[in-house]
Amino acid sequence: MQPRTLLTVALLALLASARAEEVEGSLLLGSVQGYMEQASKTVQDALSSVQESDIAVVARGWMDNHFRFLKGYWSKFTDKFTGFWDSNPEDQPTPAIES
């Protein structure tokens, strides 16, 4: 064999080997990417369920506090008007007029 032919065959063998490793590498990379996408989706689902429950707890606390405030405000409001209606002049005795 001539040196050029031997060099060309060796170069082609190296290129074929590199190409095979590249294909294997891309297959490995693809499987790792698929695994990472699946893992990130699982983590996102878990975090969203935790966030939903945290949001529900915060919303429940907010609603409880504001309803308690509204109930207190309403009772003060009704007490004032109840007191207003209770102090009707007809119910109160008239003072004696001294002459």
UniProtKB/Swiss-Prot annotation:
InterPro entries: Apo-CIII, Apo_CIII_sf. Residues 68-99 are annotated as: Lipid-binding. GO terms for molecular function: lipid binding. Keywords: Chylomicron, Glycoprotein, Lipid degradation, Lipid metabolism, Lipid transport, Oxidation, Secreted, Sialic acid, Signal, Transport, VLDL. It is found in: Secreted. One of its GO terms (biological process) is lipoprotein metabolic process. GO terms for cellular component: chylomicron; cytosol; extracellular region; very-low-density lipoprotein particle. Residues 1-20 form the signal peptide. The most abundant glycoforms are characterized by an O-linked disaccharide galactose linked to N-acetylgalactosamine (Gal-GalNAc), further modified with up to 3 sialic acid residues. Less abundant glycoforms are characterized by more complex and fucosylated glycan moieties. O-glycosylated on Thr-94 with a core 1 or possibly core 8 glycan. The record marks K41 as: May interact with the LDL receptor. Transmembrane segments: none annotated. Glycans are attached at T94. The modification Methionine sulfoxide is found at M63. Component of triglyceride-rich very low density lipoproteins (VLDL) and high density lipoproteins (HDL) in plasma. Plays a multifaceted role in triglyceride homeostasis. Intracellularly, promotes hepatic very low density lipoprotein 1 (VLDL1) assembly and secretion; extracellularly, attenuates hydrolysis and clearance of triglyceride-rich lipoproteins (TRLs). Impairs the lipolysis of TRLs by inhibiting lipoprotein lipase and the hepatic uptake of TRLs by remnant receptors. Belongs to the apolipoprotein C3 family. This is Apolipoprotein C-III.
